[in-house]
Structure formats: C-alpha cells, structure tokens
Amino acid sequence: MSEAPLAAKTEDSSLRLGLKENWQQFALLILINAFVGGMVGIERTVVPLIGSKEFGITSTTLVVSFIVSFGVIKALANLVSGQLADAWGRKRVLVLGWLVGLPVPFMIIWAPSWGWIIAANALLGINQGLAWSMTVIMKVDLVGPKSRGLAVGLNEFAGYLAVGVTAFLTGYLASRYGLRPVPIYLGIGYAVLGALLSITLIRDTRDHVRLEASASSKQSTPMSFREIFVLTSFRDRNLFAASQAGLVNNLNDGMSWGIFPLFFASFGLGVERIGILKAVYPATWGILQIATGPLSDRWGRKGLIVVGMWIQSAGLFVTAATRQFEWWLVGSLLLGLGTAMVYPSLIAAVSDASDPTWRARSLSVYRFWRDLGYAIGALSAGIIADLFGIAWAIGIIGALTFLSGTIVAAVMTSRSGREP
C-alpha cells in the first residue's frame, strides 16, 4: 500500500505537537533508546580487551578494526534510515533495527575468532543506525519546533547514560567472571526488551510530521535525496558546520573506544578501573544533556557547539599528557562535559535548518557523516598508535577536535532554537 506524502494534512484532529501532549510515547522512546545505548555499552570496556587478551592481537590497528566495521556500517544505515522512515514509517524501521541487533550478543559470546567480532559489529552498526536514528527522529516529530533541543537532550541522555552504566557493569562483571560470557548477557536482555517494546507499544509519528508541515507558513519545495545530501554535506553553511563537527566528535569517540582501554592497561590499570573510566565519559555526557539540550533552545546552538568541542580537546590533551588514574578521570569528565554540550545541539541545529518534509533525510545525512567518524577515528588512531605510540594518537586527535570547533565558530550562523 502506498503512503500519503509527508506534506499532506492529517485527518486525525486529536493529534497535537508537544512533549506534554505526547509524554507516554516520548517516555517509551526514551526507555527504548536506553536499551539501544546499552547494546553499545556492552562493548566499550571488554571487546578491545577480548582482542588483545583472548585472541592475542598485538596490532592496535587490528584491535580497533571492529570499530571500523561498526562505524562504516552504522554510517550507511544512517544514510538510508531517513529514506526508509519516510517510505515505510518510523516504527517499521525501528523494529527492523532491533531484529538485526538480536544476534549480536550471541555472536560475541560464541566468537571463535576475531572475524566473528567484526561481523557482530557490522550487525550492531545496522541496529544502531536504524534504531537510534528512529528514536531521535520520532521524538523530534512528537515535540514540534519549539522543544527540539530538549527532545534530543533527553534522547541522548537515556542512550549515553545506558552506555556508561553498561560499560561500568561489564567492567565489574569482567573483573569477577572473565571477559566472556557473563558481561555480554546484559546485551541479550537489552535486545529482547527493546524489540518487544518496539513491536507492541510504539506508534508511528508520520502524522505528527504532516501536522507540523501543514501549520508551517513556509511553502515546502520537493527535494531529491541527492539534493538533500549535497545541501546537508556542503552547500548550507549551518548544515556543513554541523556535519563536520559531528564527524570529528565521533572521530574522537571512536578513538577513545578503541585505544583508551589499551592505553590505560599499558600502565597497569586493572579492568575494573578501566571500566570506571570508560563509564564516566558517556555517563557524564548522558546526564548533562538533560541540561544542555534545553539550554540550546534558549541560548542557541553555536556557542555550545564551539565551546564543547574545545572542552573535548582539553580532555584529550589531559588524558594523553598524564599517567595517573585521577588525571585520566579528569580527562574523562572533560570529554563528557564537552560532548554533552555538542551532541544535542548539533542534532537540533540540523533540525532547525531542515524543512519538516525532508528533515528525516537531512538528519540521516548528518548522522552518516557523524558516525563515519567512528571508523575514521578508530582507523587513524590505530595507525598513529602503531607508528608513534598511543599518547601521540590521542594528542593529534585532540588538536583536530579543537580545529573543528574553530570551523564552527567561523562558519555557522547564530540562531535561536526557538526560531521557526
């Protein structure tokens, strides 16, 4: 059955835009995104150590190869997620993401070789690209234009708090029971619950998009996906600034995911304390987005993005230059603070600059570039670490992060999140 175009008016007069008006579906989507985040969290502490300790991999580049497969596949899944969301509906894409993610924890538990881990992460990339994208897009659909920063902040809070909590729990469980299989059991629970809730309780939000489009005073011009890709990637200065900042943000996150556990372990830190450091960064990032998302609605996006990128850079420099747990903890806190300022502001900035009828596709292009940063960050950090050492890899990517913030300062135009 063909779907009505997104610009068409909805016939359901009971529909309203707003967080209060849609709080039940919004709350369910927050819970589901916590499960999506938890799927990544099971890997943050233990998977790099599985590569080095169980499979005896000595090359940093090879150890981080699982992040490269994850990042490339997730970026491509992001790219098609907006198209699929407009054609099939948001709920169907969300459910598909969970069905693809169900085998991932079992593959990690039973993996007889590193190739299985890489394959599991390709499936995880599809899961994250489809499921996380839909939770973001559906929340933005529900709340309308005035609370985008709040919606994104709450979404990312749930996801990255779950990443942090799960990274801590897997580190703790690994210190007690080994790297496999016990820590990975968490992922089985996340995948089953996420799939069941998505299938049984979530409703599609395309009628909310039609409602917003019908209320807009702007005349929407139909655009092809190629036009949206070029506009989001290069042509629109705000969308370009957001896309490059998103790429660099996840570039340094991919680097930290892959080589921080190896860096800390090289100085004799145990897996439980590594788990603490790996938890502090995403947990700080997740919790503070409750504040930074709404602040971007009030203050505008640009300032938070610029300062946030510079704070991330400072956190990376502190981590690279020091050799003590306490200083690494400070570096992780700075990374979390900076990312909390940047992450919801970037998604809200892209939503601000996009028409409701092609917003999902523009967000999918932004998320393509952003999550391609995982692969670029892990691969470049692995190569630099093999050639010059891990500290050099962290420092060089810290400098690149500072440069990205400077580009946003020069290119992006200031805009309040409350502007239509």
Segments predicted by a language model, with ranges:
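C-terminal ends and interior cores of transmembrane alpha-helices
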Residues: 99-112, 311-323
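Juxtamembrane intracellular "pre-TM" segments in multi-pass secondary transporters
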Residues: 3-23, 207-242
